[in-house]
Amino acid sequence: MSLLTEVETPTRNGWECKCSDSSDPLVIAASIIGILHLILWILDRLFFKFIYRRLKYGLKRGPSTEGVPESMREEYRQEQQNAVDVDDGHFVNIELE
């Protein structure tokens, strides 16, 4: 029997020894952190455009609108929306002919 064959075929007891200690608090904590990391990564990839727009524009508070006429408020809202819409410039659109 070659050394390679012995390495490739671990005994059943060997696997049981490695897996039987899964009640260790460190293993449980690492598993929970790994699962949470995976979930957050998936959500980030699905909603990254929305999330980063909100962080860039949505959390900024504008000037107070107290005492400002409604027409000026609407104009300000429109300017803010246009600023958000223009931010799509770093995405590449490829059109095939």
From Swiss-Prot:
Protein name: Matrix protein 2
Family annotation (Gene3D superfamilies): 6.10.250.1640
Subunit structure: Homotetramer; composed of two disulfide-linked dimers held together by non-covalent interactions. May interact with matrix protein 1.
Domain notes: Cytoplasmic tail plays an important role in virion assembly and morphogenesis.
Keyword list, A-Z: Disulfide bond, Host cell membrane, Host membrane, Host-virus interaction, Hydrogen ion transport, Inhibition of host autophagy by virus, Ion channel, Ion transport, Lipoprotein, Membrane, Palmitate, Phosphoprotein, Signal-anchor, Transmembrane, Transmembrane helix, Transport, Viral ion channel, Virion
Membrane topology label: Single-pass type III membrane protein
Comment field (misc): When the channel is activated, one or more imidazole moieties of His-37 probably become bi-protonated.
Methyltransferase among keywords: no
Side Intravirion, residues: 44-97
Regulation: The M2 protein from most influenza A strains is inhibited by amantadine and rimantadine, resulting in viral uncoating incapacity. Emergence of amantadine-resistant variants is usually rapid.
Phylogenetic classification of the source organism: Viruses, Riboviria, Orthornavirae, Negarnaviricota, Polyploviricotina
Signal peptide: none
Functional note: Forms a proton-selective ion channel that is necessary for the efficient release of the viral genome during virus entry. After attaching to the cell surface, the virion enters the cell by endocytosis. Acidification of the endosome triggers M2 ion channel activity.
Any one of the GO BP annotations: protein complex oligomerization
Locations listed in the record: Virion membrane; Host apical cell membrane
Site (Essential for channel activity, possibly by being protonated during channel activation, and by forming the channel gate and the selective filter): H37
Positions of post-translational Phosphoserine modification: S64
KW Oxidoreductase (keyword) present: no
Originating organism: Influenza A virus (strain A/Equine/Alaska/1/1991 H3N8)
Ranges where the record places region Disordered: 61-80
Family classification: Belongs to the influenza viruses matrix protein M2 family.
One Pfam family named in its UniProt record: Flu_M2
Virion surface membrane side: 1-22
GO cellular component annotations of the record: host cell plasma membrane; membrane; virion membrane
Site positions for Seems to be involved in pH gating: W41
Molecular function GO labels: monoatomic ion channel activity; proton transmembrane transporter activity
